[in-house]
UniProtKB/Swiss-Prot annotation:
Residues 912-938 have a biased composition (Pro residues). PANTHER family: UPF0182 PROTEIN SLL1060. It is found in: Cell membrane. This is UPF0182 protein Mb3215c. It is a multi-pass membrane protein. It comes from the Bacteria. The chain crosses the membrane at residues 17-39, 59-81, 113-135, 169-191, 212-229, 255-277, 284-306. It holds the Pfam family UPF0182.
Amino acid sequence: MGMRSAARMPKLTRRSRILIMIALGVIVLLLAGPRLIDAYVDWLWFGELGYRSVFTTMLATRIVVCLVAGVVVGGIVFGGLALAYRTRPVFVPDADNDPVARYRAVVLARLRLVGIGIPAAIGLLAGIVAQSYWARIQLFLHGGDFGVRDPQFGRDLGFYAFELPFYRLMLSYMLVSVFLAFVANLVAHYIFGGIRLSGRTGALSRSARVQLVSLVGVLVLLKAVAYWLDRYELLSHTRGGKPFTGAGYTDINAVLPAKLILMAIALICAAAVFSAIALRDLRIPAIGLVLLLLSSLIVGAGWPLIVEQISVKPNAAQKESEYISRSITATRQAYGLTSDVVTYRNYSGDSPATAQQVAADRATTSNIRLLDPTIVSPAFTQFQQGKNFYYFPDQLSIDRYLDRNGNLRDYVVAARELNPDRLIDNQRDWINRHTVYTHGNGFIASPANTVRGIANDPNQNGGYPEFLVNVVGANGTVVSDGPAPLDQPRIYFGPVISNTSADYAIVGRNGDDREYDYETNIDTKRYTYTGSGGVPLGGWLARSVFAAKFAERNFLFSNVIGSNSKILFNRDPAQRVEAVAPWLTTDSAVYPAIVNKRLVWIVDGYTTLDNYPYSELTSLSSATADSNEVAFNRLVPDKKVSYIRNSVKATVDAYDGTVTLYQQDEKDPVLKAWMQVFPGTVKPKSDIAPELAEHLRYPEDLFKVQRMLLAKYHVNDPVTFFSTSDFWDVPLDPNPTASSYQPPYYIVAKNIAKDDNSASYQLISAMNRFKRDYLAAYISASSDPATYGNLTVLTIPGQVNGPKLANNAITTDPAVSQDLGVIGRDNQNRIRWGNLLTLPVAQGGLLYVEPVYASPGASDAASSYPRLIRVAMMYNDKVGYGPTVRDALTGLFGPGAGATATGIAPTEAAVPPSPAANPPPPASGPQPPPVTAAPPVPVGAVTLSPAKVAALQEIQAAIGAARDAQKKGDFAAYGSALQRLDEAITKFNDAG
């Protein structure tokens, strides 16, 4: 019976081929065009910043890795196809209706497309995936030694940090490549007749057998290599149910030998597989593969399970003791918690204190922080916003400066940035948004330890921050009334101004000044940017490229762009640092500071690893998620680390966007490796100017990770560690509106690191006992240049109330609750509790301080900004409460205790502070109402009605009662007296 010829593929006409080529060209252009534009823009941007070498190094590495991986993987797959084709049978009998014959005809008709196209496509995909691992490859090429060896194999930790990840990557690619080559070879032999299936039987040509068996043998050999590398990865492995990270008793005594046994079995199986080439018997490799599978189940899984259940669990604490000690040592090393960094001291926490002892603790009592940076932002907006398009973030920052008397003080600080999203009406058109409203103006600082005036009621004047302002004044000169002199308060770069989808500004001289700057009583003053930052935009090529990038035709047609124009974009400080140092993880908190008369944003950068042997693997998002991060939706990306260093301090100039990287950790091997990859990008630590060092602070995210780990790894004894009985807990935020951990707080207080009474800027946190609300420890991280980075842990052995119990005691105190009930007026006014600070005072005592704010009405409107109305304290179960720190300290410790506390700043003629030099008033919202005052007593021959006389007597009686209650510290009576006074004044005004 004759064979039917296979159907031929229809040929395309010339017109069809042209249309297909055009369509493919359009697709390629759509896919590659935006990437080419982005690459060119990045080349310009990195060059403008002075970091073009970073861009070219990354680009070259990615291209080389993509090409090498693509050629290797594609070449291996091509080899599998080519061998199958070259060794195909000369004659393949075709049966009727054989589907393989049709496929064979299709492949033969498009042999070059199939033979080259499939490997090329696979190679391209492999290259695209591989180029994303450019950092791992660069670390392998430039990584060095740690100078520390692992306790099991004696290898330097640089092997685990830099080499092992690279070997794993290469092994994974080889396994995938050989497997794909096996599949390609198998399919090709089937199509070309090297493998024929007929019913329940089949035929296999010699070339097909040799090639397929060889590829399987290579796969088994690669599996043997994988077993060898698995041994090292055990040291960063976490077995379920263990309170520590790393290889435990079962891993070392069962899993580790099992890996060696499996490796030996894999080598034997590989030999058995290769033997099929000569013996022509596929049963031998089949038996070998089954043996390998059974061995992995029995030796690799079954035996360790038996050891765990029979040997380890009955005596787990003793069996795991050695390995717990390894984990304690490694975790402390990996997270910077070694004995040269962390100092432990016993601290009673409940020692009695006299008024004289408290007053002598001047560094603490004079700096008790009253302003909560998460609460006072509406007050900044009310008094310092000036225009609708200026904006302050919801959470402000804390920094320290020397006051006019040379004393160290902490300040709530904020940059008055431009928020493009708050532009209204015609301000939103393209020219105004991108060429007129281009920058913010001003640096605002408020002493954190005081407010202006006393507000006994949220409707009274007082209780608002004292504002120190650096701003462009009405005559165009800089008004420097802030905590430090500032030459240039204009802000072109910042986290607020960049918080839009198109955050670019077009600046530069092109005719008259165009940018909005400030207003006088007569007109609006304009400005032209003169900084060095910005990508030139004068040429038509640049205009075309940016028109395509931002999909905006005005780049091409607008006459506001001239030969001197520049474009400022990518204006977020943290993102600029991450771009020029892509190997860094940045802290979630970026803060402004005045350094050498320049306003800069300070960014903390971390180097991290996720495979440090025996070190605990920590989720950054979980460890850093305190109540502030949750409330302001500022959670860091989920990233797991087992090693972290605050290796880099970066500054971003708020005016011209200059990024400067400084080496902070001179011993970090990871940073040293990256400094070899990108030489010259990170300046040595010695280049940090003293003026900058005075504003560097211990980073929040690192501290939160460390306190989470100190909760476990302060324990030295492995048996105690295993029992978890001596662990600590990070306390929950006691504020009833919070739902996560209590955040750490920056404060100025007495020097815990030096154990003296000098003022020190530090980051502090209380720690609870494990699953209890009593204090276990107090952690302080020094930010002073001389002791920067030192952690001091005060361990508290007694039963001292933790933050939750302290907050409960304060809020349920009868005097406090009655007074705030009167102020709240049945929820007509909103009461808010500020941050609960824990402060060591006197000789072994702990003072809790919690400011109380109130705002008129129940809304969060800026016009209803919160005022400080009370200060609550607790010491040794006793509550102190009053309008000022001095009153609260006196109530706790007696007369004289508040002698060194900072007093309340006077109000300026009972008028709230005016907004910064001559900007227009806030767009909306009334000014705070004046304090309610008693009507003057009539004098002379004025006859009052009996009703007015009676009301006046009630007024005088209420004033006298209020004074007596204030002297006695009876704030429940004081609140009642204020209410009587309001009622009496109303009666007086209504009386005829």
